[in-house]
């Protein structure tokens, strides 16, 4: 009886130590697509059908046309909220001005930095998670996450012109696996230059366990253009090539990947 009592006490003691470490360290739980991504989408400037742009003109009244060119901004922001924010559904929700200040406070953190301890994160009361809050307060988020226009002038975008070989994709694949293995996230710039079938940023957040018979590796992707479900990226070791799934705004097929926000000037 005494032995069992000591065993129970030891379990409580270890659980307490774990909670203290989580509160005081940069522990970061795995990203949940349904909880930790935005409820609103980044809209394409053009209208698409079967992955190809059409000549059909978008109307000013089209609600999907109001928030565009933010794929980099939204992918980066999901990383920042995952690392530097926490939610408290028990407290009263902030007014628009207070919420805007806290969103900008999160956006000022370097996305490549280590996750903050829970007690040092920016707190967002009134909501359980990012998905819930961004659905209820969409306009405040869209006004304060940052400019999409500025992402066109990121210095590392130039890699698509001169880093186009398979050796570079091998290195990127290794960096991707290393990032996911240590519990980090990986913002990916997708390009098919000199073809222009895709010029886009997404967030790779998990790898499917195991391999297919061909050795193909599968990854789960948050795509800011598609908020309803994760997308899939694959890596073929034989061809040393990434492939992104077909969608309404992409024909599907091989893409080159360049990591973004993994370090300064990237």
Question: Predicted segments — roles?
Answer:
Residues 29, 195-199, 208-266:
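Cys-His-centered catalytic/binding microenvironment captured across papain-like cysteine peptidases
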Residues 2-14:
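Bacterial N-terminal signal peptides that target proteins for export
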Residues 70-72, 185, 199-202, 216-218:
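Extracellular structured ligand-interaction cores
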Residues 24-28:
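Sec/Tat signal peptide C-region and signal peptidase I cleavage site
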Residues 158-174, 261-266:
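Exposed acidic/polar residues on beta-strands and adjacent loops within beta-sheet cores, strongest
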Residues 12-23:
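Bacterial N-terminal signal peptides
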Residues 31-167:
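Cysteine-nucleophile protease catalytic domains, especially the papain-like/related folds used
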Residues 164-210:
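Active-site-adjacent substructure of cysteine-protease-like catalytic cores
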């Amino acid at each position: 009886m005494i032995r069992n009592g000591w065993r129970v006490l030891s379990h409580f003691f270890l659980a307490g130590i774990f909670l203290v470490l989580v509160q005081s360290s940069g522990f970061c739980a795995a990203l949940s697509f349904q909880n930790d991504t935005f409820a609103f989408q980044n809209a394409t400037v053009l209208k698409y059908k079967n992955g190809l742009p059409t000549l059909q003109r978008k109307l000013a009244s089209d609600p999907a046309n109001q928030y565009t060119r933010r794929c980099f901004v939204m992918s980066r922001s999901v990383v920042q909220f995952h690392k530097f924010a926490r939610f408290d559904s028990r407290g009263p929700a902030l007014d628009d001005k207070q919420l805007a200040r806290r969103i900008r406070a999160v956006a000022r953190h370097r996305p490549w930095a280590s996750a903050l301890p829970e007690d040092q994160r920016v707190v967002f009361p009134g909501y359980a998670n990012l998905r819930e809050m961004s659905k209820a307060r969409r306009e405040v988020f869209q006004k304060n996450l940052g400019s999409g226009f500025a992402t066109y002038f990121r210095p590392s975008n130039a890699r698509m012109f001169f880093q186009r070989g398979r050796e570079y994709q091998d290195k990127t694949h290794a960096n991707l696996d290393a990032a996911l293995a240590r519990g980090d996230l990986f913002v990916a710039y997708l390009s098919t230059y000199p073809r222009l079938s895709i010029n886009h940023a997404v967030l790779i957040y998990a790898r499917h366990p195991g391999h297919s018979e061909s050795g193909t590796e599968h990854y789960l992707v948050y795509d800011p253009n598609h908020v309803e479900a994760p997308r899939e990226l694959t890596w073929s070791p034989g061809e040393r090539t990434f492939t992104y799934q077909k969608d309404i705004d992409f024909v599907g097929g091989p893409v080159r990947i360049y990591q973004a926000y993994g370090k300064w000037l990237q």
